[in-house]
């Protein structure tokens, strides 16, 4: 009898413990994936109703010059994470860059937003708590190990192969790890696509710092990583440590800022659109991002900061220490009159100073106000818009993000310009992968716009008549 009572007491304790455990779990903050499971059904229904009620509504017109002009300004894509206003600049889920700098969680003692928190925001439209952000940092760290064949592929790449080519190759090789590809091959229902796309995206983001760092250390140093991923560190801090800059607290802050503000810029730019386009064919996140990285590698897209630095070095040499506004203005006019352009100024959409430029300028004013290259960039900023506006070089004579980021990296000793686009690529993954997950969750179809030949366009415009 005593034994029975003892058993009952033990059983009650066990039940109480289980009950408390369940209660604790039930009241714990939801994970990112759990929040998506809660959010997506309502979002999908909203889109379904929108198409039902307004599916035949005209949302814009297309001019012939747009068809021949890179499709600029054509309303034809859905991109949930960010919207680019020509005057205000980018808004992430309705929030400006100053907003996210203020609202998003930060590292202990840090002042810059964490890219993990932005990833959460872009996916859900919500600002995560510090605990949720920390959990995401830990998940990225836990899933960071590279498959052996990817490590060997990077290590065997010749050092003269451009870092972006190596980056794309390594990301493509991660296709072997794709849960989405495996699930699709087994016939998983399309309502489950987003879950496997989510898992692949987390896995991919987790592995990018190690891939980027191995490429950097192989091409420019001794091939050895100076650190390992630390589960106690945030994403930007781990990336900085792997590159060899982990002891510099300011550089850690720069990586957090850099990864956040370079992440997303609407869906029409080459890297974002390419990732979305390839993903619309139900290619995995690994193949889709690799395609986007190849677009980012193009000199008209992700190479701007490298070209700006090359131009600044030449300008510095020619000015020979005279960084006066008068000397800079003369050089700019000589450049324009010679048929060349001033890199780092102008944008396809923006008509004011890029707020991403402003964020980097404020960082420089705080951390490197006396740095020679920053002083030069700062003086150019005060002179160039007036010169470019007077000349008519661009509809937007204001600086873009590419005119400043390279200077910040140079200051801290990351001077290898050909690697800069790899950092851009790591950052851009934080913007394009959330949309890929949402594409699958909302059941977005394969992209297939209509094309015409020039002869067909001639026939078409003649039938319509001139304006």
Curated annotation (Swiss-Prot):
GO terms for biological process: carbohydrate metabolic process; citrate metabolic process; tricarboxylic acid cycle. Its main location: mitochondrion. It is an enzyme of class 2 (transferase). The active site is at 301, 347. Signal peptide: none annotated. Pathway: Carbohydrate metabolism; tricarboxylic acid cycle; isocitrate from oxaloacetate: step 1/2. InterPro entries: Citrate_synth-like_lrg_a-sub, Citrate_synth-like_sm_a-sub, Citrate_synthase, Citrate_synthase_AS, Citrate_synthase_euk, Citrate_synthase_sf. GO terms for molecular function: citrate (Si)-synthase activity. It is found in: Mitochondrion matrix. Keywords: Mitochondrion, Transferase, Transit peptide, Tricarboxylic acid cycle. Citrate synthase is found in nearly all cells capable of oxidative metabolism. This is Citrate synthase, mitochondrial.
């Amino acid at each position: 009898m005593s034994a029975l009572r003892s058993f009952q007491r033990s059983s009650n304790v066990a039940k109480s413990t289980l009950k408390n455990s369940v209660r604790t779990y039930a009241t714990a903050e939801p994970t990112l994936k759990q929040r998506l499971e809660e959010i997506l059904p309502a979002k999908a229904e909203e889109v379904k109703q929108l198409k039902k009620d307004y599916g035949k509504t005209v949302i814009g017109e297309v001019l012939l010059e747009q068809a021949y002009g890179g499709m600029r300004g054509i309303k034809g894509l859905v991109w949930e994470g960010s919207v680019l206003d020509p005057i205000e600049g980018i808004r992430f889920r309705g929030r400006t860059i100053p907003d996210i700098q203020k609202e998003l969680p930060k590292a202990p003692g840090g002042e810059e937003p964490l890219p993990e928190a932005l990833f959460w925001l872009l996916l859900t439209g919500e600002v995560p708590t510090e605990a949720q952000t920390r959990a995401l940092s830990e998940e990225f760290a836990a899933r960071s190990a590279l498959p052996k064949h990817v490590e060997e592929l990077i290590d065997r790449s010749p050092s003269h192969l451009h870092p972006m080519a190596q980056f794309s190759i390594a990301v493509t090789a991660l296709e072997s790890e794709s849960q989405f590809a495996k699930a699709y091959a087994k016939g998983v229902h399309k309502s489950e696509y987003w879950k496997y796309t989510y898992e692949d995206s987390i896995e991919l983001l987790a592995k990018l710092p190690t891939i980027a760092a191995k490429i950097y250390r192989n091409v420019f140093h001794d091939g050895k990583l100076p650190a390992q991923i630390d589960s106690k560190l945030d994403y930007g801090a781990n990336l900085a440590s792997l590159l060899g800059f982990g002891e510099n607290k300011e550089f850690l802050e720069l990586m957090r800022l850099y990864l956040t503000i370079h992440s997303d810029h609407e869906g029409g730019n080459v890297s974002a659109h390419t990732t979305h386009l390839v993903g619309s064919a139900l290619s995995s996140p690994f193949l889709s991002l690799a395609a986007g990285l190849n677009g980012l590698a193009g000199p008209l897209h992700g190479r701007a900061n490298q070209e700006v630095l090359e131009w600044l070095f030449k300008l510095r040499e020619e000015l020979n220490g005279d960084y006066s506004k008068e000397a800079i203005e003369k050089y700019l006019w000589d450049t324009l009159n010679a048929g060349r352009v001033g890199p780092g100024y102008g944008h396809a959409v923006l008509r004011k100073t890029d707020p991403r430029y402003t964020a980097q300028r404020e960082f420089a004013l705080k951390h490197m106000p006396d740095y020679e290259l920053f002083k030069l960039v700062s003086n150019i900023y005060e002179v160039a818009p007036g010169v470019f506006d007077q000349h008519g070089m661009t509809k937007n004579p204001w600086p873009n993000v590419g005119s400043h980021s390279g200077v910040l990296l140079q200051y801290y000793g990351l001077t290898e310009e050909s690697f800069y686009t790899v950092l851009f690529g790591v950052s851009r993954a934080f913007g394009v992968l959330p949309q890929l997950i949402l594409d699958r969750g909302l059941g977005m179809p394969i992209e297939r716009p209509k094309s015409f030949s020039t002869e067909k366009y001639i026939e078409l415009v003649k039938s319509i008549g001139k304006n």
